[in-house]
A protein has these predicted regions:
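A broad, structure-centric signal for solvent-exposed, well-ordered loop/edge residues
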Residues: 8, 33-36, 82, 96, ...
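Acyl-donor binding region in acyl/amide transferases
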Residues: 92-208
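Generic preference for well-ordered secondary structure
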Residues: 10-13, 22, 30, 57-59, ...
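Residue-level signal for well-ordered alpha-helical segments
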Residues: 11-15, 22-23, 50-52, 97-99, ...
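Short amphipathic alpha-helix that is part of the acyltransferase structural core
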Residues: 4, 14-84, 88-91
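Histidine (H) residue identity feature
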Residues: 9, 30, 53, 61, ...
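Eukaryotic low-complexity, non-globular regulatory regions
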Residues: 1-9
Length: 208
């Protein structure tokens, strides 16, 4: 556990979540303006709601050097046409051009080297707070599954963030609770560049 112009690379099929066909629609960003919409939503969730300190190249937008190499899944609210959910996808060819996966800024991925040509990285997933009932994330997952199948990719990686405002105790508890049953086999394990001292930080409380 660690402490710490748009190019299209795949083909995601526009779709609609079957139980909410009139409310939401899924698409892939095809223009810089659509990517900017995703970045604005990310800023709203990560900076304004969760308090992340972001280094923004454009005010009010969460962006970094990986964005222009990624594909961006979008879920729009049909009535307003606004983006209310997004997922960022970095396919292997784009990661090669970029020179790395985002995860490699946090972890050593040496043991996944033989998987790289079939390995997709996802991240920057977020949903507008008014639409977290389950339908939007289900639609994003459906789009991600379709993306993987259509492009013949086999492996999915990515980082998930856990808040550290309590000094890392909850993050340590999360690792303690999930590690015994969910650690990858040793030949696939990745190691953090800035390791969280979970042995010292874990408490008797349940992770949240």
């Amino acid at each position: 556990m660690s402490q710490n112009q748009n190019t299209l690379h795949g083909q995601a099929t526009p779709a609609t979540e079957s139980t909410e066909t009139s409310r939401f629609r899924l698409s892939q960003a095809h223009s810089e303006s659509e990517v900017l919409e995703a970045q604005r939503l990310r800023y709203k969730v990560f900076a304004e709601e969760l308090g992340a300190h972001l280094q923004c190249r454009v005010p009010g937008h969460d962006s970094d050097i990986f964005d222009s190499y990624c594909d961006h899944l979008l879920v729009r609210e049909t009535a307003s046409d606004r983006v209310i959910g997004t997922y960022r996808i970095l396919p292997p060819d784009a990661a090669r051009k970029m020179g790395m996966y985002y995860s490699e800024s946090e972890f050593y991925l040496n043991r996944l080297q033989h998987l790289r040509t079939r390995m997709v990285e996802v991240g920057r997933s977020c949903i507008h707070p008014d639409h977290r009932g389950g339908a939007v994330i289900a639609l994003l997952w459906a789009g991600l599954a379709d993306y993987m199948v259509r492009n013949n990719y086999e492996y999915l990686i990515g980082c998930a963030s856990i808040g550290m405002v309590d000094g890392g105790h909850n993050a340590a508890n999360v690792f303690r609770d999930i590690a015994p049953a969910h650690m990858a086999p040793i030949e696939y394990q990745c190691f953090p560049k800035n390791r969280l001292p979970f042995e010292r930080l874990a408490t008797n409380q349940s992770a949240v």
